[in-house]
Amino acid sequence: MAYPMQLGFQDATSPIMEELLHFHDHTLMIVFLISSLVLYVISLMLTTKLTHTSTMDAQEVETIWTILPAIILILIALPSLRILYMMDEINNPSLTVKTMGHQWYWSYEYTDYEDLSFDSYMIPTSELKPGELRLLEVDNRVVLPMEMTIRMLISSEDVLHSWAVPSLGLKTDAIPGRLNQTTLMSARPGLYYGQCSEICGSNHSFMPIVLELVPLKYFEKWSASML
């Protein structure tokens, strides 16, 4: 859950988000080292009085600044590709949920059940109870079992939307006429909030997403009560 004046990411709840945080730290360190080197070279150029006017080329230096960036790009690309393959890999999901974006709400359908579907609208500020979050609460939460692989099928009925839950490392476009998929797995129970992340009209800011991850036995009770 985000909090005011937050500068970093939300706490990771899924293996994918943990990998993304590690990759962010890895890349940030490389950027920091490059920036330090460039700043050091610029400071030397501004402060030194030495010149070498007779030198027309330097093969050694040109070789270094050709090979070194290539090595740096490889160090960034390899872990990035690894995470991309992890995000695309979906093997034998325990549950499949179909998500449809509308102007301006979400609808969900549990495809493993015969008649389990509902719409999820934002609760207006005037109807919030004490302790509830403004612009983030919904009338129907998406209840899912924790520690299980869940496949989300995401599309749209009208315009472009984007289904995003930052703490789980999820952000998938909802495109009319196209079915995208992503996978999620939560390591612990809790409420996880997200919002539509693609400008989709006047009420774009009023399309929250709330996932409630619970142990399997509580999910079974909830699904039985909804049928």
From Swiss-Prot:
<keyword id="KW-0597">Phosphoprotein</keyword>
<dbReference type="Pfam" id="PF00116">
    <property type="entry name" value="COX2"/>
</dbReference>
<feature type="binding site">
    <location>
        <position position="200"/>
    </location>
    <ligand>
        <name>Cu cation A1</name>
    </ligand>
</feature>
<dbReference type="InterPro" id="IPR011759">
    <property type="entry name" value="Cyt_c_oxidase_su2_TM_dom"/>
</dbReference>
<keyword id="KW-0999">Mitochondrion inner membrane</keyword>
<dbReference type="GO" id="GO:0005507">
    <property type="term" value="F:copper ion binding"/>
</dbReference>
<dbReference type="GO" id="GO:0005743">
    <property type="term" value="C:mitochondrial inner membrane"/>
</dbReference>
<dbReference type="GO" id="GO:0042773">
    <property type="term" value="P:ATP synthesis coupled electron transport"/>
</dbReference>
<feature type="binding site">
    <location>
        <position position="196"/>
    </location>
    <ligand>
        <name>Cu cation A1</name>
    </ligand>
</feature>
<dbReference type="InterPro" id="IPR008972">
    <property type="entry name" value="Cupredoxin"/>
</dbReference>
<comment type="similarity">
    <text>Belongs to the cytochrome c oxidase subunit 2 family.</text>
</comment>
<dbReference type="GO" id="GO:0045277">
    <property type="term" value="C:respiratory chain complex IV"/>
</dbReference>
<keyword id="KW-0472">Membrane</keyword>
<dbReference type="InterPro" id="IPR014222">
    <property type="entry name" value="Cyt_c_oxidase_su2"/>
</dbReference>
<comment type="subunit">
    <text>Component of the cytochrome c oxidase (complex IV, CIV), a multisubunit enzyme composed of 14 subunits. The complex is composed of a catalytic core of 3 subunits MT-CO1, MT-CO2 and MT-CO3, encoded in the mitochondrial DNA, and 11 supernumerary subunits COX4I, COX5A, COX5B, COX6A, COX6B, COX6C, COX7A, COX7B, COX7C, COX8 and NDUFA4, which are encoded in the nuclear genome.</text>
</comment>
<dbReference type="InterPro" id="IPR002429">
    <property type="entry name" value="CcO_II-like_C"/>
</dbReference>
<feature type="binding site">
    <location>
        <position position="198"/>
    </location>
    <ligand>
        <name>Cu cation A2</name>
    </ligand>
</feature>
<keyword id="KW-0679">Respiratory chain</keyword>
<feature type="transmembrane region" description="Helical; Name=II">
    <location>
        <begin position="60"/>
        <end position="87"/>
    </location>
</feature>
<feature type="transmembrane region" description="Helical; Name=I">
    <location>
        <begin position="15"/>
        <end position="45"/>
    </location>
</feature>
<dbReference type="InterPro" id="IPR036257">
    <property type="entry name" value="Cyt_c_oxidase_su2_TM_sf"/>
</dbReference>
<feature type="binding site">
    <location>
        <position position="200"/>
    </location>
    <ligand>
        <name>Cu cation A2</name>
    </ligand>
</feature>
<feature type="binding site">
    <location>
        <position position="204"/>
    </location>
    <ligand>
        <name>Cu cation A2</name>
    </ligand>
</feature>
<feature type="binding site">
    <location>
        <position position="198"/>
    </location>
    <ligand>
        <name>Mg(2+)</name>
    </ligand>
</feature>
<keyword id="KW-0460">Magnesium</keyword>
<comment type="function">
    <text>Component of the cytochrome c oxidase, the last enzyme in the mitochondrial electron transport chain which drives oxidative phosphorylation. The respiratory chain contains 3 multisubunit complexes succinate dehydrogenase (complex II, CII), ubiquinol-cytochrome c oxidoreductase (cytochrome b-c1 complex, complex III, CIII) and cytochrome c oxidase (complex IV, CIV), that cooperate to transfer electrons derived from NADH and succinate to molecular oxygen, creating an electrochemical gradient over the inner membrane that drives transmembrane transport and the ATP synthase.</text>
</comment>
<keyword id="KW-0812">Transmembrane</keyword>
<feature type="binding site">
    <location>
        <position position="207"/>
    </location>
    <ligand>
        <name>Cu cation A1</name>
    </ligand>
</feature>
<keyword id="KW-0813">Transport</keyword>
<keyword id="KW-0186">Copper</keyword>
<dbReference type="InterPro" id="IPR034210">
    <property type="entry name" value="CcO_II_C"/>
</dbReference>
<feature type="topological domain" description="Mitochondrial intermembrane">
    <location>
        <begin position="1"/>
        <end position="14"/>
    </location>
</feature>
<feature type="binding site">
    <location>
        <position position="161"/>
    </location>
    <ligand>
        <name>Cu cation A1</name>
    </ligand>
</feature>
<feature type="topological domain" description="Mitochondrial matrix">
    <location>
        <begin position="46"/>
        <end position="59"/>
    </location>
</feature>
<protein>
    <recommendedName>
        <fullName>Cytochrome c oxidase subunit 2</fullName>
        <ecNumber>7.1.1.9</ecNumber>
    </recommendedName>
</protein>
<keyword id="KW-0496">Mitochondrion</keyword>
<feature type="binding site">
    <location>
        <position position="196"/>
    </location>
    <ligand>
        <name>Cu cation A2</name>
    </ligand>
</feature>
<dbReference type="GO" id="GO:0004129">
    <property type="term" value="F:cytochrome-c oxidase activity"/>
</dbReference>
<feature type="topological domain" description="Mitochondrial intermembrane">
    <location>
        <begin position="88"/>
        <end position="227"/>
    </location>
</feature>
<keyword id="KW-0249">Electron transport</keyword>
<dbReference type="InterPro" id="IPR045187">
    <property type="entry name" value="CcO_II"/>
</dbReference>
<keyword id="KW-1133">Transmembrane helix</keyword>
